[in-house]
Curated annotation (Swiss-Prot):
Descriptive protein name: Small ribosomal subunit protein uS2
Sample GO molecular function, one term: structural constituent of ribosome
PANTHER family with a match to the protein in the record: 30S RIBOSOMAL PROTEIN S2 PROKARYOTIC AND ORGANELLAR, SMALL RIBOSOMAL SUBUNIT PROTEIN US2M
Family indicated by similarity: Belongs to the universal ribosomal protein uS2 family.
Superkingdom assignment: Bacteria
Keywords of this entry: Ribonucleoprotein, Ribosomal protein
Residues spanning the signal sequence: none
InterPro entries named in the record: Ribosomal_uS2, Ribosomal_uS2_bac/mit/plastid, Ribosomal_uS2_CS, Ribosomal_uS2_flav_dom_sf
Amino acid sequence: MAVISMKQLLEAGVHFGHQTRRWNPKMAKYIFTERNGIHVIDLQQTVKYADQAYDFMRDAAANDAVILFVGTKKQAADAVKEEAERSGQYFINHRWLGGTLTNWSTIQKRVARLKEIKRMEEDGTFEVLPKKEVALLNKQRARLEKFLGGIEDMPRIPDVMYVVDPHKEQIAVKEAKKLGIPVVAMVDTNTDPDDIDVIIPANDDAIRAVKLITAKMADAVIEGRQGEDSVESVEAELAATETQADSIEEIVEVVEGSNE
């Protein structure tokens, strides 16, 4: 049985490609037809390739692969973060910083700085610093978290990279290829598929389409890590964690409010 049904794909609008004038001819074999100047993706192929991508992600996770989810455009940012976290993996959902993979040692220094600022707040250092300095540190932390928060705890360069819209994320894909990291990606009709190892022909501009495919890739990771029956239990566990996190945030707000 397919991991994603034709009905699910249709409802999420996965079949809508780009305008015909914006197509990449290398995607021709994944296109079913053209309607009103828009290419329509062949969903029978999407079903098949989604199955292959699922198996690839599941098997990688079963071998303890570190997987990086990448999607920096607004339609992808939330899904990439949520599904990476749900599957216990890592993400970049804001601008890709050049050298994130190929200049890993420098990126690690920035991550170390982020952790240092967090420690300063936790150990009370902030309380003895001038307010102006604390404000600058908070600003620096916010920026570092925005770009690097999703890989703060990533133990090493990823073994696999999942990408939403490799046309937009060309720098990320090039870095992965340079390092021999396989790329799994949602590939729309305007994209060159040659640099993608595992292709999922799909509309990468619709929020529902991105969420559907990305969630299935996260399910594959969860299954690979913990077995086929574990997806629901992991979701329940994460829901409990989120509730706990919310209560902690409330406590922080109360403490901050009392210091004003």
